[in-house]
């Protein structure tokens, strides 16, 4: 199987596992030594981190119906290591009723080819995407006072 195809297939499997509320399916793509730096969560490493992540996902899926869309910008291959980056668009709808939560995270995945030749997610980092504060329509005129920091 072509390497780019294999990583795209693994990303699709991650998305499907998320949308079907199946933490085991999601984590089947993970390397046993996964390093997880998810936004707003504790750093997690290896098997204990995978166990904690699985529990956290199960708790999330008990409370919400989840819809994840993955936008991959690029996949770069360098031997037995690869990385991809892009956005995860997430909608969480409370099962008990209420307004849906929408969030867009930017992410970086680092993949490692294992001894069997399969690509596994080795390192994951994400954080919430924000609007560009330097869009021309938001830049004050030369005489305007600016408050805040850059």
Where are these regions (language model features)?
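A solvent-exposed, acidic/Ser-Thr-rich amphipathic alpha-helical stretch
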Residues: 2-8, 12, 20-78, 87, ...
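A mature extracytoplasmic/lumenal domain signature
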Residues: 87-88, 125
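Beta-strand elements of well-folded, non-transmembrane domains
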Residues: 90-94, 111
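Short beta-strand edge/turn micro-motifs at domain boundaries
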Residues: 104-135
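Terminal "cap-and-tail" regions of soluble proteins that handle hydrophobic small molecules
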Residues: 120, 131-150
């Amino acid at each position: 199987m072509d390497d780019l195809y294999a990583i795209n297939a693994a990303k699709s499997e991650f998305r499907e596992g998320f949308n079907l509320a199946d933490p085991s399916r999601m984590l089947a793509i993970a390397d046993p030594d996964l390093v997880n730096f998810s936004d707003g969560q504790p750093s997690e490493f290896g098997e204990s981190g995978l166990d904690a992540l699985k529990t956290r996902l199960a708790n999330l899926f008990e409370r919400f119906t989840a819809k994840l869309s993955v936008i991959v910008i690029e996949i770069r291959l360098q031997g037995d290591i690869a990385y991809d980056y892009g956005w995860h668009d997430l909608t969480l709808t409370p099962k008990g009723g209420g307004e849906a939560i929408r969030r867009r995270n930017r992410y970086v995945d680092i993949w490692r080819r294992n001894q069997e030749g399969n690509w596994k997610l080795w390192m994951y980092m994400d954080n919430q995407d924000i609007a560009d504060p330097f869009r021309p329509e938001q830049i004050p005129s030369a005489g305007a006072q600016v408050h805040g920091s850059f």
